[in-house]
């Protein structure tokens, strides 16, 4: 069994002061196999099978069978039992695809300050720390990889009154303004979903100083919301399209 994830993360964070976030995840593999059917049941052993990834097909067919209609699943004590019915009731064999966790195989994913992606030298430094004899269990195999970057563009139109136009432009587009602060927030952690509402909030309600005036309306075309995995990080692509309109606010 792999060592506790939080223990690995703790030591990764001590490897270098530029590391601001990290994940330690058990590695996985997807397997395909043909199973023989015995009295309407097929079996697959293994204590780390992820049953929610299971795909069942009639042998040699490309179309997936339907769970609860063509088969049911029971998984206990390291044995996966697939009971066939419906279109699979008479099958003599079935094809399955399933993902399993690899015991003792741990993948370390560090993130650097400002959303920086670690290079080979930094990854080697992390491995030197976590492979110490008093940290890594003897049965664990540890690797270190960079996070996967998911890029986003920014395209917005915001609205301001004539009286506050100059101030709002500075608060939205200026150095340290809403766009800069959104990008800083977005890239600061692994697995942080790309969330346009966070950009909208900073444009409409700037809160990093006293008595700051924000836009009274904003249309955010990009980015759109996107959920990220724990080992992904959002990265601003550099593609920025910003315009503003001056109107009298209707109260």
PLM regions: where:
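Residue-level signal for short segments within beta-strands and strand-turn junctions
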Residues: 58-60, 112, 203
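Extended beta-strand solenoid/passenger and fiber regions
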Residues: 1, 5, 9, 29-99
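A broadly conserved detector of short glycine/acidic/proline-rich loop/turn motifs that flank catalytic sites
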Residues: 49, 60, 148, 160-162, ...
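A broad structural signal for short, well-ordered beta-strand segments within beta-sheet-rich domains
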Residues: 18-19, 43, 47-53, 88, ...
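Hydrophobic/anchoring residues in structured secondary elements
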Residues: 21-27, 56, 73, 220-223
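An aromatic-glycine-centered, glycine-rich loop/turn in mixed alpha/beta architecture
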Residues: 165, 169-251
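Intrinsically disordered, low-complexity, polar/charged repeat-rich segments
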Residues: 31-34, 40, 45-47, 153, ...
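Carbohydrate-recognition loop of C-type lectin domains
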Residues: 2-29, 97-192
């Amino acid at each position: 069994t792999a060592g506790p994830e939080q223990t690995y993360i703790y030591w990764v964070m001590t490897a270098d002061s530029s590391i601001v976030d990290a994940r330690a995840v058990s590695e996985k593999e997807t397997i395909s196999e043909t199973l023989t059917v015995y009295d309407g049941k097929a079996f697959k052993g293994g204590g780390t099978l992820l049953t929610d990834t299971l795909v069942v097909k009639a042998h040699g067919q490309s179309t997936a069978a339907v769970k609860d209609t063509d088969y049911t699943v029971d998984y206990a004590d390291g044995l996966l039992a697939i009971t066939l019915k419906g279109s699979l009731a008479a099958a003599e064999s079935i094809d399955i695809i399933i993902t399993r966790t690899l015991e003792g195989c741990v993948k370390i994913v560090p993130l650097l300050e400002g959303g920086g992606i670690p290079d080979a030298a930094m990854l080697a430094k992390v491995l030197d720390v976590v492979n110490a004899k008093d940290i890594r269990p003897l049965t664990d195999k540890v690797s270190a990889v960079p996070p996967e970057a998911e890029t986003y563009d920014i395209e917005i139109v915001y609205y301001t009154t004539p009286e506050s136009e100059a101030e709002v432009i500075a608060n939205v587009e200026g150095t340290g303004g809403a766009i800069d602060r959104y990008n800083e927030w977005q890239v600061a952690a692994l697995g942080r979903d790309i969330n346009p509402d966070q950009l909208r909030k900073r444009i409409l309600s700037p809160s990093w100083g006293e008595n700051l005036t924000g836009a009274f309306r904003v249309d955010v075309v990009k980015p759109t919301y996107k959920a990220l995995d724990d080992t992904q990080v959002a990265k601003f692509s550099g593609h920025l399209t910003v315009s503003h309109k001056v109107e009298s606010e209707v109260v």
